[in-house]
Curated annotation (Swiss-Prot):
<feature type="modified residue" description="Phosphoserine">
    <location>
        <position position="61"/>
    </location>
</feature>
<comment type="subunit">
    <text>Interacts with anti-sigma-F factor RsbW (UsfX). Its phosphorylation may prevent this interaction.</text>
</comment>
<dbReference type="InterPro" id="IPR036513">
    <property type="entry name" value="STAS_dom_sf"/>
</dbReference>
<feature type="domain" description="STAS">
    <location>
        <begin position="7"/>
        <end position="115"/>
    </location>
</feature>
<keyword id="KW-0597">Phosphoprotein</keyword>
<dbReference type="GO" id="GO:0006355">
    <property type="term" value="P:regulation of DNA-templated transcription"/>
</dbReference>
<keyword id="KW-0804">Transcription</keyword>
<dbReference type="InterPro" id="IPR002645">
    <property type="entry name" value="STAS_dom"/>
</dbReference>
<protein>
    <recommendedName>
        <fullName>Anti-sigma-F factor antagonist RsfB</fullName>
    </recommendedName>
</protein>
<comment type="similarity">
    <text>Belongs to the anti-sigma-factor antagonist family.</text>
</comment>
<dbReference type="InterPro" id="IPR003658">
    <property type="entry name" value="Anti-sigma_ant"/>
</dbReference>
<dbReference type="Pfam" id="PF01740">
    <property type="entry name" value="STAS"/>
</dbReference>
<keyword id="KW-0805">Transcription regulation</keyword>
<dbReference type="GO" id="GO:0043856">
    <property type="term" value="F:anti-sigma factor antagonist activity"/>
</dbReference>
<comment type="function">
    <text>Positive regulator of sigma-F (SigF) activity. Binds to anti-sigma-F factor RsbW (UsfX) preventing its binding to SigF, thus activating transcription.</text>
</comment>
Length: 122
């Protein structure tokens, strides 16, 4: 998938769960690449979608908007979770209250377990 230099998007299937791993910066310049990647994955009608922001270095307001729009678009038809840790990603998601809109996880392992309906040990 072609993307601007300041973002990387990797799509993988983890036993039926679509995982988008994002790296770099999510801003006005890279937003279209992220929206395109999410659109392609959602078009395949996955049962669950995890967006992994572990390698994101900057999460602008447009990225928060994309996450909220994705959650709204897929509704209850697709289980949805976001991996965010650290102040770059987790803090803005929490401050905007988006952690009440979609499930937020600290690790990919927890996200995969969570969207599959499993128990997450803390």
């Amino acid at each position: 998938m072609s993307a601007p230099d300041s973002i990387t998007v990797t799509v993988a299937d983890h036993n039926g769960v679509a995982v988008l791993s994002i790296g770099g910066e999510i801003d006005l310049i890279t937003a279209a690449a992220l929206e395109e990647a999410i659109g392609e994955v959602v078009a395949d009608n996955p049962t669950a979608l995890v967006i992994d922001l572990s390698a994101v270095e900057f999460l602008g307001s447009v990225g928060l908007k994309i996450l909220a729009a994705t959650s709204e678009k897929i509704g209850q038809s697709v289980k949805f979770g976001v991996v965010a840790r650290g102040s770059v990603t987790r803090r803005p998601i929490h401050l905007m209250g988006l952690d009440k809109t979609f499930r937020l996880f600290s690790t990919l392992h927890d996200a995969l377990t969570g969207v599959r309906g499993g128990r997450i040990d803390r």
